[in-house]
Amino acid sequence: MSDLEPAKNPEGASHVSVLLGEVVAALASGPGDMVIDGTFGAGGYTRAILATGASVTAFDRDPSVQRFAAEFSATDGRFRLIQDRFSQITEYLEDASVDGVTLDLGVSSMQLDEAERGFSFMRDGPLDMRMGADGPTAADLVNDLDHTELARILYVYGEEHASRRIASFIIKRREERPFTRTLDLAHVIERALGGRKGAKVHPATRSFQGLRIAVNAELDELEAGLLAAERVLKPGGRLAVVTFHSLEDRIVKNFLAERAGRTPGGSRHLPPVEAGAPPSFQLISSKAIAPGEAELAVNPRARSSKLRAAVRTTAPVWSEAS
């Protein structure tokens, strides 16, 4: 863990950025460099990157981060926040113009701690789950989707094997009254799964993950963001991505392996490339970097995190390769 002071959440408790020291090392930024913090949050990565002497352009679609950004804007002219999704980087920055891009994926502990955001199955709040200010809420999905689509979301995005049973319980209950609160939904999921007493993981964990990913189109956003990073990074620029579950990690792993010439890869979101396209990235490490025991002791949230990093080569972006 870095000895840099972590950013603070609204309640004053520390919001500790995961794998902070490892991310800073992977970016290897310094004075004169421009780094993109694609998931600003409470500013933990931004603070550490600024400490290296680099400038930071941060992105975040969550309006609530403005209160953290104001602190940086007031004290450091090397920082700016763009209130948008990280997949939109190319709308604001020129190709091959930045020295580093970092992404810290998924929901933050800050968002989980704020019951009114509707992400938590442990705190009662409106069934929202939106990271931004617009679009359908989790309540919209739970109350409107048919059984097939609801079960698909829980299975594909939540990796919940009891997805059909949970969807059936949800639909039966919503016929009586619509879902509006997080704990209401969590209790129905618990009943569908029989409580799973003694389980270390809450029964609603996977279902809430699936709904959150669907509400925010997180996997589509990730793949679009990786393509954007490939475009805006200079030759020698570095990409560092922290993931928290297998769906995210698989996308990042396959993208970087493919772009480094390690595997054919392939995704419905990525443009087709002819065989023999020159590698656009070189892997910094062939394996993901995991948190050490010291970090896990003080930050349990880091338990499932993985860091993958790579260096941009001089090759063109793959959509332009021939």
UniProtKB/Swiss-Prot annotation:
InterPro entries: RsmH, SAM-dep_MeTrfase_MraW_recog, SAM-dependent_MTases_sf. It holds the Pfam family Methyltransf_5. It catalyses: cytidine(1402) in 16S rRNA + S-adenosyl-L-methionine = N(4)-methylcytidine(1402) in 16S rRNA + S-adenosyl-L-homocysteine + H(+). One of its GO terms (molecular function) is rRNA (cytosine-N4-)-methyltransferase activity. One of its GO terms (cellular component) is cytoplasm. S-adenosyl-L-methionine binds at residues 43-45, 60, 86, 104, 111. GO terms for biological process: rRNA base methylation. It is an enzyme of class 2 (transferase). Keywords: Cytoplasm, Methyltransferase, rRNA processing, S-adenosyl-L-methionine, Transferase. Its EC number is 2.1.1.199. It is found in: Cytoplasm. HAMAP family: 16SrRNA_methyltr_H (MF_01007). Belongs to the methyltransferase superfamily. RsmH family. Specifically methylates the N4 position of cytidine in position 1402 (C1402) of 16S rRNA. This is Ribosomal RNA small subunit methyltransferase H.
